[in-house]
Design a protein with these regions (language model features):
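Conserved long hydrophobic alpha-helices within structured protein cores
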Residues: 40-42, 137, 333
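Terminal peptide-recognition signature
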Residues: 45, 105, 196, 257, ...
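Short coil-to-beta-strand transition motifs
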Residues: 71-81, 348-359
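Glycine-centered loop/turn motifs
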Residues: 58-62, 186, 337-345
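Short regulatory "switch" loops immediately downstream of catalytic or recognition motifs
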Residues: 48-50, 65-69, 85-91, 142-144, ...
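Charged- and aromatic-enriched interaction segments used to assemble
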Residues: 69-74, 91-246
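Acidic, small/polar-enriched beta strand-loop surface segments
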Residues: 1-18, 122-131, 135, 191-357, ...
Length: 415
């Protein structure tokens, strides 16, 4: 048994708020399901102010929320900017006035729907096209540096490569699918980048510091092959509200996939046995994949994995202050990220046969004084796995782990 008392570090515009007590916190990150791209992370933060001290917080100030793990190391769990700020009196009397500072912050993805681009792109792979769009918005050049900026305000070790990075994280480059060129057509950055990510069978996301990142189609397969599953037990979760759902809405047995420049061409795939059982459940997927063979591969991939329904883990909650939760599991949950492979054991036998294998799609932290819980939603492992290229295979992979009858063309990582 391990006792865990949350220790927080809240920074706003680089200033650590050490004299204020965190009274309430809600953080939501990721996405609700695998069929959509991630939305901006959301943070609702309340700090108790017992001294009526002047608070220097403004709209667009940076926000960083960190939580200590079992090694007393601060782990970032949210990064973003202030969008709403208020001061409210909660009690008043002869002994004084108590206030609460109410702060709402959003992650860097919130900037993309409000930024416009002509979106001119040459034919290139998905990761490179996404980087081309995002770097123009999130990496400043000399002409975009604020005129009043002074060198003395920079860390001497800072390099120009990241000195004016205002939100760009890790981008998987070049990606795995070659996408068609794009001519000038004004649109918002979020719509364009989301479409490019969908075309590459990947997803955009915010990391724990709030930076915008992109994971390509084999990102999860490679991570799983390299690091394996994070194992947790349902015995340490809050059983009330633990939920697995199997939905007809997840079934896709008639796929039309549009591809090429302006999505002018299309391929199709259908699964007759699935149609016989569930009826025809069709979907049109719009991409800018360049090559017909890649478009057909994508259509077949959607069909192979989604022709029959699979259980989704829509909700499981862990109270991180639970003393039965060991340090390793607690630290893994504090470090949760979109795409974390989890193996949840000790479920009731009528729920995923007692063990669920999946990837984290979204999560929320909820905290009060000396309390914190994390709620996860996961997709089935097979919804995400993609065959890797030779050069992507982890160097530690052993030949004896691969069945002799497996062809590389159809190999999926199931470790």
């Amino acid at each position: 048994m391990t006792v865990f008392n949350p220790v927080w570090r809240v920074k706003i515009q680089g200033v650590e708020y050490t004299t204020y007590t965190l009274s309430n916190l809600t953080i939501t990150s990721g996405r609700n399901n695998i069929y959509q791209q991630a939305q901006a992370g959301y943070c609702n933060l309340e700090l108790l102010n017992l001294t009526q001290a002047i608070v220097n917080i403004h709209i667009n100030d940076s926000v960083s929320i960190e939580l200590q793990d079992s090694t007393a190391t601060y782990v970032p769990i949210f990064g973003g900017t202030v969008v709403d700020f208020g001061v409210e009196i909660i009690t008043a009397g002869s002994v004084g006035i108590n206030q609460v500072l109410k702060i709402t912050a959003l992650g860097a993805l919130s900037r993309l729907p409000k930024a416009l681009t002509d979106g001119v792109l040459s034919q290139d792979f998905d990761g490179d096209q996404i980087y081309e769009i995002l770097q123009d918005l999130l990496l400043n050049n000399w002409g975009e540096v604020p005129a009043a900026l002074q060198w003395q305000n920079y860390d001497p070790s800072e390099t120009w490569a990241n000195a004016q990075n205002v939100g760009l994280g890790e981008i998987d480059r070049p990606g795995n699918y070659e996408l068609a060129q794009r001519s000038s057509d004004r649109t918002d950055v979020y719509s364009l980048v989301s479409a490019l990510a969908t075309s590459g069978l990947g997803y955009i996301y915010e990391d724990a510091s709030g930076l915008i990142s992109y994971a390509d189609s084999t990102h999860r397969s490679i991570y799983l092959a390299t690091n394996g599953y994070t194992d947790v037990t349902a015995n340490h979760a809050l059983f009330n509200g633990l939920k697995i759902e199997t939905r007809a809405g997840d079934v896709r047995n008639d796929i039309t996939l549009k591809y090429n420049t302006n999505s002018n061409n299309e391929v199709s795939a259908e699964d007759i046995p699935s149609i016989d059982v569930y009826g025809r459940l069709a979907q049109v997927i719009t991409t800018t994949v360049k090559h017909t063979v890649d478009a057909q591969d994508q259509a077949d991939f959607y069909l192979t994995l989604r022709a029959t329904p699979q259980a989704n883990f829509t909700s499981i909650t862990y109270q991180l202050t639970n003393p039965e939760l060991d340090d390793a599991d607690r630290d893994s949950l504090i470090n949760v990220f979109m795409g974390l492979p989890l193996r949840i054991s000790d479920l009731p036998p009528n729920m995923a046969s007692g063990t669920f294998l999946g990837f984290v799609e979204g999560w929320s932290f909820k905290a009060a004084y000396n309390e914190i819980a994390v709620t996860l939603n996961l997709s089935p492992i097979s919804y995400s796995l993609q065959a890797m290229k030779w050069e992507q295979v982890p160097i530690g992979e052993s030949w004896n782990t691969i069945t002799g009858a497996l062809t590389w063309e159809t190999a999926l990582v199931v470790a």
